[in-house]
Regions:
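N-terminal/domain-start segments enriched in small and hydrophobic, helix-friendly residues
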Residues: 6-9, 13, 92, 99-101, ...
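Glycine-rich, charge-decorated loop segments at or immediately adjacent to ligand/cofactor-binding or catalytic sites
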Residues: 60-65, 109-113
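Charged phosphate-binding loop/patch that engages nucleotide di/tri-phosphates or the phosphate backbone
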Residues: 110-130
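Non-catalytic, surface beta->alpha helical segment in thiol-disulfide oxidoreductase systems
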Residues: 72-115
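Local sequence-structure signature of Cys/Sec-based thiol-disulfide redox active-site neighborhoods
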Residues: 2-39
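Short alpha-helical
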Residues: 27, 55-58, 87
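Thiol-based oxidoreductase modules, predominantly thioredoxin-like and allied folds used
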Residues: 21, 41-59, 65-67
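Active-site/pore-lining binding-face segments in mid-to-C-terminal subdomains
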Residues: 61-70, 74-77
Length: 130
């Protein structure tokens, strides 16, 4: 396993992890690694790791990976993405940008949920069954 963690300032939450789950025998994974490392260098605010699910089985645990490479993006709040990804630097970069844009602040989520709760008949598609 290779890990490239940036130093975290004590005053902020830990950086999200971007983990490529791969296998040494996978030619696509071997070709993808330099591109993955290039994206890692371009995003120093994130932590990147390369995990060979066979060589690093003690770390990979029971992940059932069927398609390589598989990407896992997770932070302190949970899994943001897990699935196979086309092995292109541009695809990974777009995925990371989309995940960052799609992660609203807790205040924004709380405000939306409060508005929905205040007028459920206006928004709810089907009321919950009694």
């Amino acid at each position: 396993m290779t890990v490239a963690p940036p130093p975290d300032a004590p005053s902020r939450a830990p950086s999200p992890w971007v983990v490529c789950l791969c296998a040494q025998w996978c030619g696509t994974c071997r070709d993808y690694r330099p591109l993955f490392e290039e994206v890692a260098r371009a995003h120093p605010h994130l932590r990147f790791a390369w995990v060979d699910i066979e060589d690093d089985a003690d770390v990979a645990g029971d992940f059932d990976i069927e398609t390589f490479p598989t990407l896992l993006v997770a932070d302190a709040e949970g899994t943001r993405f897990m699935g196979p990804l086309l092995p292109h630097a541009a695809t990974l970069t777009r995925t990371l940008a989309a995940l960052r844009a799609a992660h609203p602040s807790e205040a924004d989520v709380a405000a939306l949920l409060a508005a929905l709760a205040a007028a459920p008949a206006r928004f709810e598609l089907a009321p919950p069954a009694a």
